[in-house]
Amino acid sequence: MLICNDKSNPKTLLEEIMALRPWRKGPFEISQIKIDSEWDSSIKWDLVKNATPLKDKVVADVGCNNGYYLFKMLEHGPKSLVGFDPGVLVKKQFEFLAPFFDKEKKIIYESLGVEDLHEKYPNAFDVIFCLGVLYHRKSPLEALKALYHALKIKGELVLDTLIIDSPLDIALCPKKTYAKMKNVYFIPSVSALKGWCERVGFENFEILSVLKTTPKEQRKTDFILGQSLEDFLDKTDPSKTLEGYDAPLRGYFKMLKPSKR
């Protein structure tokens, strides 16, 4: 949890926080008020925080949401930090949080998507984190290309995506929805993902972790509006989504942009 012992008026603060729902990423604590977000993002952060050193590096978080991971990255001493997310509400959440957790104003927040990266930030970053974005893209290869071209030579990509458990070079393409999400297009096997990354030009593809999503990590709270994981799974068989697909399984990976291609 990110904690800030500020002297703000708790009542006014809580009103501001609730007006910014739903809070997907967190948790945060400000003036003893806990923002109990839908996702316990510390679980994911613990899996990727030591993937590569961030000290004195130029770092990006693509799909940064409200900035939770950016604030955690500050603790590792990067040279600079840029977050990318086109969402309007999550930027408002970031603007609310930044005075508490980025008092030196080191973070740049860009309202841009992954498709904008290579044009606006070519060969710019030593490290890019892209967590929970790839399966939302209609063209995952184009998204990987954009990430590749935004990295410096010998830059590293830390990637998290939904995956399917299969030894084959295949991807699940949900017919209409996956776990009630309409914007999920391709969920690859690890082997298929490795092939995509290598076709784009990445090398040294490394599996950091594979983890099932559980109610400990994603659940309904008073700080979101609507449903969460428990509502997306089959009540009689939680190993399946409501649509009959395998329940969410996430892979965490690291790869390198080589010096020559």
From Swiss-Prot:
Q: What is its EC number?
A: 2.5.1.-
Q: One GO molecular function term? A: methyltransferase activity
Residues annotated as binding carboxy-S-adenosyl-L-methionine: K25, W39, K44, G63, V114, E115, Y135, R250
Keywords from UniProt, A to Z, are: Transferase, tRNA processing
Broad class of enzyme this protein falls into: transferase
Q: Please cite one Gene Ontology biological process associated with this protein.
A: tRNA wobble uridine modification
Task: State the SUPFAM superfamilies in the record.
Answer: S-adenosyl-L-methionine-dependent methyltransferases (SSF53335)
Q: Which InterPro entries match?
A: CmoB, Mo5U34_MeTrfas-like, SAM-dependent_MTases_sf
What does the record give as the reaction this protein catalyses? carboxy-S-adenosyl-L-methionine + 5-hydroxyuridine(34) in tRNA = 5-carboxymethoxyuridine(34) in tRNA + S-adenosyl-L-homocysteine + H(+)
Is Ribosomal protein found in the keyword set? no
The entry sums up its family as follows: Belongs to the class I-like SAM-binding methyltransferase superfamily. CmoB family.
Q: What does this protein do?
A: Catalyzes carboxymethyl transfer from carboxy-S-adenosyl-L-methionine (Cx-SAM) to 5-hydroxyuridine (ho5U) to form 5-carboxymethoxyuridine (cmo5U) at position 34 in tRNAs.
How this chain assembles, per its entry, is:
Homotetramer.
User: Under which name does UniProt file this protein?
Assistant: tRNA U34 carboxymethyltransferase
**Protein source organism:** Helicobacter pylori (strain ATCC 700392 / 26695) (Campylobacter pylori)
